[in-house]
């Protein structure tokens, strides 16, 4: 009797639930005055999916529950054959903006056949997704075109760009500039295997068992018996790892950028001759799997040197080499760096907990010391009195024998305690090349260890960055915009260069090259940039992003101008630096549509409206300038070209142009790139 009652209640609940679903669908406000979806009979649309408007679903398509495909504003949508749309996917379009489909018709969203859109992804038109693409979990594709076979990994943003076919967008990447999209790596076999696993795993359970009407509520007549599943307990291998958190973060960062992980080992004799033997490469793409493989190498080659290799598989080159084990280290004890990391203060003196009370080492200097040790360099010590310091006469204080960070910092602090009233600097020594790679002043007689490198330091040496105060900007004198630019270039595997010029040569666009910035570590590059700004105070300085594989420039951005004040090693104020950094038209900014104006030069609202109108019509923007004498003769000179089509970047470039030619006439040009003619000439600045 009880079983019959329960069965009757279940049947009533099932009937009421299905009726409620149909009623809710009929009463939705956007379902009125819209075209009905065109769903192929062989396609499967779950009853809990929301499909509204002119959506054309082709054979073999699978739409999982919780998905929302709304063609209520931008229409129509085309979803090609055998497309897999997983749980929680949102597909929507703007009222304006269309893409050209493979059938030469205009669509708000086009999804090619065989494409997989994974859980919680957002595809917002106008968007074109080619055939056999993969859009990863929680990724966003907005106003973009993704070529056939491209793979967009998890938590990525693809906006306002065209991704070439068969390219890989790493997890967490923000691709908002076309030059970023052009430099993406190729999809590897491991990536294809991962995509096939995801598609196959969710495609097996997506085949329909009943009709494909999206308003039909499909519930099983009887629940299947629950089969006990033996779960494998998850063991966090990081608790017993033999590599410190810095190396773990390095591995995660390399994997997030799509790089492979390898390792090499050498005994003490081979290490002196730099004769390394390969440990192999780590299979898989999950950080825990790769970290476990690296730990296995450390256990296997205990008592030897082991270094980690980051591999760009597309360009077949190494992007990083870091020593993670030495003969004195014991695998399984994460002692490296734990004491010093805890002892160093992020905003103050950074005094070691076990050091002498008078030993004072700045946090930035400690980071540079750590970087030297990780690259296998020896550390030397030199000191000088105030009189000898003026003449550059340094006395040798010996070398630090230990290669462990904690012991090296303790020994350095003891040396500082013995020379409290003298200048002290550390020397980075390449034992194989028998040369100095860095000279960093870490202590001064007044107790301030944030000085500049001594006059005898080489051009490739490090510069000790000032320690920021509680309310100051980070990374010494560089602005957050410049730091973000450098970080983005390094993350994409590009090299960093600099150029400088004076006011006279700047007008003629004649730049002199600064010494090359070697190394791929962010702290080293930022320190050398600060040294370059200090060496060329009162001049224009611009940063260059260099694609070493293609041997081309991907970025030219001004980071210092003659009017900027450099005080105590600091670069210009944030407002002036913002103007400088945006003067280049192909900047490396995020381009997310935020506010454009951070500079002292503001564009008139009419100019902003004019620029917005030109860009909306597909025209390019250019500028010309002239002085009063040439203006009478109608003789204009072209400014730096503006290649970007993003409104915020164009406006920032215009502000930079006005600042560069203050006191002159500047006029705005609207250019039709197809007909190669000018459609607008208007003066936006007068003397």
From Swiss-Prot:
Residues 366-445 are annotated as: RbcS-like repeat 2, SSUL2. Residues 328-355, 442-476, 565-590 are annotated as: Disordered. One of its GO terms (molecular function) is structural constituent of carboxysome shell. CDD domains: LbH_gamma_CA (cd00710), RuBisCO_small_like (cd00307). It comes from the Bacteria. Multiple forms of the protein of 73 (full length), 62, 52 (the most predominant form) and 36 kDa are seen even in the presence of protease inhibitors. CcmM52 interacts with CcaA. The keyword Repeat applies. GO terms for cellular component: carboxysome. Residues 599-687 are annotated as: RbcS-like repeat 4, SSUL4. PANTHER family: CARBON DIOXIDE CONCENTRATING MECHANISM PROTEIN CCMM, CARBOXYSOME ASSEMBLY PROTEIN CCMM. The N-terminus has a gamma-class carbonic anhydrase-like domain (CA), while the C-terminus has 4 repeats that are similar to the small subunit of RuBisCO (rbcS), called SSUL. The SSUL are connected by flexible linkers. The N-terminal domain forms a scaffold on which CA and other carboxysomal proteins assemble, while the C-terminus binds RuBisCO. This is Carboxysome assembly protein CcmM. It comes from Synechocystis sp. (strain ATCC 27184 / PCC 6803 / Kazusa).
């Amino acid at each position: 009797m009880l079983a019959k009652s329960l069965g009757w209640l279940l049947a009533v609940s099932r009937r009421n639930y299905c009726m409620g679903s149909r009623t809710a669908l009929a009463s939705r406000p956007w379902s009125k005055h819209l075209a009905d979806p065109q769903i192929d009979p062989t396609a499967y649309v779950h009853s809990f999916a929301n499909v509204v408007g002119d959506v054309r679903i082709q054979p073999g398509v699978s739409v999982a529950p919780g998905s929302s495909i709304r063609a209520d504003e931008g229409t129509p949508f085309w979803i090609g054959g055998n497309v897999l749309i997983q749980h929680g996917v949102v597909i929507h379009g703007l009222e304006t903006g269309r893409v050209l489909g493979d059938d030469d018709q205009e669509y708000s969203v086009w999804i090619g056949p065989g494409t997989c859109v994974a859980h919680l992804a957002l595809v917002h038109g106008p968007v074109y997704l080619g055939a056999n693409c993969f859009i990863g979990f929680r990724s966003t594709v907005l106003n973009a075109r993704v070529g056939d076979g491209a793979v967009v990994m998890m938590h990525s943003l693809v906006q306002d760009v065209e991704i070439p076919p068969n390219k890989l967008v790493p997890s967490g990447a923000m691709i908002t500039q076309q030059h970023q999209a052009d430099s993406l790596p190729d999809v590897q076999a491991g990536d294809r295997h991962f995509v096939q696993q995801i598609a196959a795993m969710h495609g097996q359970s997506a085949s329909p068992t009943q009709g494909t009407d999206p308003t039909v509520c499909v519930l099983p007549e009887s629940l299947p018996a629950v089969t006990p599943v033996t779960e494998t307990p998850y063991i966090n291998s990081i608790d017993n790892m033999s590599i410190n958190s810095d190396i773990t973060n390095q591995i995660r960062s390399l994997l997030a950028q799509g790089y492979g992980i390898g390792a090499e080992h050498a005994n003490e004799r081979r290490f002196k001759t730099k004769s390394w033997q390969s440990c192999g490469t780590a299979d898989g793409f999950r950080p825990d799997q790769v970290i476990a493989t690296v730990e296995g190498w450390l256990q296997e080659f205990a008592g030897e040197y082991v270094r980690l290799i980051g591999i760009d598989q597309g360009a077949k080159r190494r992007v990083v080499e870091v020593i993670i084990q030495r003969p004195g280290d014991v695998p399984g004890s994460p002692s490296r760096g734990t004491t010093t990391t805890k002892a160093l203060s992020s905003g103050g003196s950074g005094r070691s907990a076990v050091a002498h009370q008078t030993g004072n080492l700045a946090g930035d200097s400690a980071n540079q010391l750590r970087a030297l040790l990780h690259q296998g360099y020896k550390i030397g010590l030199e000191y000088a009195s105030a009189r000898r310091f003026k003449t550059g006469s340094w006395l040798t204080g010996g070398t630090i024998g230990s290669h462990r960070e904690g012991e090296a910092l303790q020994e350095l602090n003891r040396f500082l305690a013995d020379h409290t009233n003298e200048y002290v600097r550390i020397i980075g020594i390449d034992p194989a090349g028998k040369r100095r790679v860095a000279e960093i002043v870490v202590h001064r007689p007044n107790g301030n260890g944030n000085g500049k490198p001594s006059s005898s330091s080489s051009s490739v040496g490090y510069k000790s960055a000032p320690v920021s105060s509680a309310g100051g900007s980070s990374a010494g004198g560089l602005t957050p915009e410049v730091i973000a630019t450098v970080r983005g270039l390094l993350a994409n595997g590009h090299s960093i260069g600099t150029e400088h010029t004076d006011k006279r040569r700047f007008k003629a666009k004649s730049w002199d090259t600064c010494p090359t910035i070697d190394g791929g570590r962010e702290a080293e590059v930022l320190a050398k940039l600060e040294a370059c700004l200090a060496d060329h105070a009162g001049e224009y300085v611009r940063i260059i992003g260099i694609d070493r594989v293609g041997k081309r420039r991907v970025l030219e951005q001004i980071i210092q101008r003659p009017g900027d004040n450099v005080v105590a090693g600091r670069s210009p104020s944030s407002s002036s630096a913002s103007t400088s950094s945006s003067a280049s038209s192909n900047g490396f900014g995020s381009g997310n549509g935020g506010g454009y104006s951070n500079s002292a030069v503001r564009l008139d609202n009419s100019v902003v409206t004019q620029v917005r109108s030109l860009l909306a019509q597909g025209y390019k923007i250019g500028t010309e300038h002239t002085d009063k004498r040439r203006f009478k003769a109608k003789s204009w000179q072209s400014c730096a070209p503006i290649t970007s089509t993003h409104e915020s970047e164009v406006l920032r470039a215009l502000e930079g142009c006005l600042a560069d030619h203050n006191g002159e006439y500047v006029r705005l040009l609207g250019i039709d790139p197809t007909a190669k003619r000018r459609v607008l000439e208007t003066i936006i600045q007068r003397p």
